[in-house]
Amino acid sequence: MNTDTTLFILEDCRANLLIVEDEKTLQALYPYWDQLPHLKKIIKWGQPINDLLYSGNVINWTDVMTLGMEFEDNRPMLERHKNIAINQCCSLIYTSGTTGNPKGKIILFRSINI
């Protein structure tokens, strides 16, 4: 997916979190940080990042895992899980956009309820 398409999707869905797989992708997208007002953090998979380059806006996946371990005792997600309704959005999937901009398709929890 090219940068323009990625930026369109991030703005269209008002993404507040982005996970990138490598430094190349991070370096391609980070210059657009100021154009994505909803984006709060970028999580980078793999090697640790140089936080000084990214002003605290990017964290490494291992840091996310550490935060998860700290939350394990508090169980904040358990309470959120109890409040999920079957008609709420579970996932947002975008089409390829062959005839224009990609279009988002909402997948509800009831669609994947097993």
Which residue ranges define each predicted feature?
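Conserved pre-ATP/AMP-binding loop-to-beta segment of ANL
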Residues: 58-62, 66-94, 101
